[in-house]
Amino acid sequence: MISKNIKLVKGVLDSLVEDSKGLVVMDFGCGKGVFAEHLKELGHKYIGVDIDRDALEGLSERGFTTYHPDNLPKDLGVDILLLGNMGGIETGMHLINARKLLTYEGVVFMWDFSYQGLPKGKSQSTVAMSVVSKGG
């Protein structure tokens, strides 16, 4: 069963790739690549990046391009960079470095469903999702 959160992200992804084919989408912190098949079906190239070598191996076996963050080429021409549920990772530095991977009109899409760090008074059902940055 697909969770509400994944459905929500897929909906935003669909709007980002709408009317496009052949975009390069990099999923930073991809895990098992929950969006890989969906993006492939829509005609886009999916690249998974994670520190979990087992997860990367599973994605590779399914025919997807994968990289460990330490071995990431700088010339991939990424159109959409996905940064989801990054947890304790220093997000600010990732955003700075991520912009270097993007094409001129590339987009960083960041979301977090962990609810940690929400201002007091916000319910856990509040989810912050936004297009964070345009490359260039």
Q: Which residues does each predicted region cover?
A:
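Conserved alpha-helix/loop element of class I SAM-dependent methyltransferases that forms part
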Residues: I2-K21
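Conserved beta-strand/loop positions that form the S-adenosyl-L-methionine
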Residues: F28
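Class I SAM-dependent methyltransferase SAM/SAH-binding core
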Residues: V34-T66
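Conserved beta-strand signature within the Rossmann-like core of class I S-adenosyl-L-methionine
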Residues: E105-F113
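Core SAM-dependent methyltransferase catalytic element
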Residues: S125-G136
